[in-house]
Amino acid sequence: MKKLIAMINLMFVCLGITFAKDITISVGAGDNWKAKREPQVAIWLEDTDGNYIKTLYVTERASHKSWIMGPKEGRPESLPVWYHASKFKPAKNAAPDLKLDAVTSATPKGGIIFETELEDKAYVLRAEFNTSFDYNDFYTKKTSGVNGQPSVIYEAAIPADFNKSSEEIRLTFSGTGALDGSDGLIHKNTEGLTTAQTIVKLVAVVGK
């Protein structure tokens, strides 16, 4: 029986057929989740070489570019790492150059939870969060515009064999986005961050 299963699996590999696995992604709201403004959120997949694959979740305002009194160039600084990775233009009058096959919603009051499917491959899961007007003594209104503190990014490696029921992987903090949205790099300098680090209390992936 084991030999038969092994032969079937080998046949699927040779034919390039991959299996899908169900996962649940949850974001626990932190103390600063809605302290000043509702946060903007993007959650997406990359391959292990850092190439963008697809967006799994993004807040409506970021995806629809519906910024209140926002400039015509939009708000690239709101979710700069995601905007650059996905090549989704933040400008209000930009053409819809990217079709988002993702869960999209207004920011929930108490965190986020949704289900999705992944192929049996290795991935990097990234999540970016930002709250506008989140000023402090380091990121002042004079020096940081409407952004306040920069976006914060969390990530985790999802192995190809991640399909065990109730197995959990938690994303860890990996850095910040560009304060002015000028690049899509994850900056490791966290000097001056305060409340931005409490937008979320956890981001987790659970196998089903």
Language-model segments: residues:
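Sec-dependent signal peptide recognition
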Residues: 2-13
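Short coil-to-beta strand junction motifs in C2/discoidin
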Residues: 36-42
